[in-house]
Amino acid sequence: MEAQNQEVAALVEKIAGLHAAISKLPSLSPSAEVDALFTDLVTACVPASPVDVAKLGPEAQAMREELIRLCSAAEGHLEAHYADMLAAFDNPLDHLARFPYYGNYVNLSKLEYDLLVRYVPGIAPTRVAFVGSGPLPFSSLVLAAHHLPDAVFDNYDRCGAANERARRLFRGADEGLGARMAFHTADVATLTGELGAYDVVFLAALVGMAAEEKAGVIAHLGAHMADGAALVVSARHGARGFLYPIVDLEDIRRGGFDVLAVYHPDDEVINSVIVARKADPRRGGGLAGARGAVPVVSPPCKCCKMEAAAGAFQKAEEFAAKRLSV
C-alpha cells in the first residue's frame, strides 16, 4: 500500500508540473512546444496506475479539472487545424491518415462496434446519433463507413464552426456515405423528441466536462431516448482521468439505463467504453439491472470479470477466452 501511495504521489507531482508548464503557454494551437508538452502528459497518463482521481485532495482535484479544460481546448485547436488541412484536398476522405491519431479512432470505433453487437444482441441500428462530434467526426465516420453501412448518422455539436468543418470533409465523398452523415448545431440539452428516434446514441468524452454536467446529460438522454435503445459512452479510467472526465456508472444507472459492459483499454487507445441500454419496462430491465452484474472487459479480453452494481462485487462465471480484436 505504501508503495502504491508513493507511486500515486509521484504521478500527481509529475502531472502538476506538466499542468504548470501547459498553463504558461501563450497559445494552445499546434506547435512544437505544445505538441511536446501534451505528448509528455499523455505518456504519463496512459500506463496502468493505482490512482483513483475521484479520491484526490481538493488542490489536486482543482488542478485536474483545469487540466481537462486545457486538454479540451488543445484538442479543439488540433482538430480544427487538421480539418482545415484536409479540406484543402479534392477528396478529404482519402487523406484522413494525415491526422496523427487517426489509427486510434479506427481502433476505438471497431471496439465500440464489437462491444455493441456483443452486449446488445440482435441490434441492427438504422438511426444513430453522435453527440459531441466536433470538426473531425472520425468515430461516426469510421462506424458509418465500415461497421454500420445501413445506418443514418446525425452528428450533434454545439459549435457551428466545428460542424461546418466536418461537412467540408465529405466534399467529393461517395454519395452513399455522404448522404448518411448529417451535422446539426445543437446542445444535447435542447433535444427531446429527436432522441426517441435513435437506436443508438454515442456520447463523446468531452460532452459534460464536470461530473454534475455529465450526470445531467445522461439523465436528459435517459428521459428522452426510446426504451431499449443503446447508449455508448466514451470515458476515462485511472490516470487517464487527468486528460478527460470520468463517468460514474451510478450516474448512468440513475439516468434510467442498464449498464451492460465496461471496457478499460491498456494500449494507445485512451478511451474507456461503456455500453448501456435504456431500461425497457416491457422486458423487466436488461442484462445488468440495478442489482445485476456488469462485465468489465479486461484487455485483451482474455476473461471478463463481473462488477456488481451499487459498488458491490459478485463472482460470476468466466467467459470464454475469445479475443476481442482491437
UniProtKB/Swiss-Prot annotation:
Gene: NAS2
GO biological process: nicotianamine biosynthetic process
Gene Ontology molecular function: nicotianamine synthase activity
EC code: 2.5.1.43
Short name of one Pfam family: NAS
Superkingdom per UniProt: Eukaryota
Family membership noted in the UniProt record: Belongs to the nicotianamine synthase (NAS)-like family.
Keyword terms, alphabetized: S-adenosyl-L-methionine, Transferase
Protein name: Nicotianamine synthase 2
InterPro entries with a match to the protein in the record: Nicotian_synth, SAM-dependent_MTases_sf
Tissue-by-tissue expression: Expressed in roots.
UniProt entry tagged with the keyword S-adenosyl-L-methionine: yes
The keyword Heme is assigned to this record: no
Function (record text): Synthesizes nicotianamine, a polyamine that is the first intermediate in the synthesis of the phytosiderophores of the mugineic acid type found in gramineae which serve as a sensor for the physiological iron status within the plant, and/or might be involved in the transport of iron.
Catalyzed reactions: 3 S-adenosyl-L-methionine = nicotianamine + 3 S-methyl-5'-thioadenosine + 3 H(+)
Protein induction: By iron deficiency in roots and chlorotic leaves.
Signal sequence residues: none
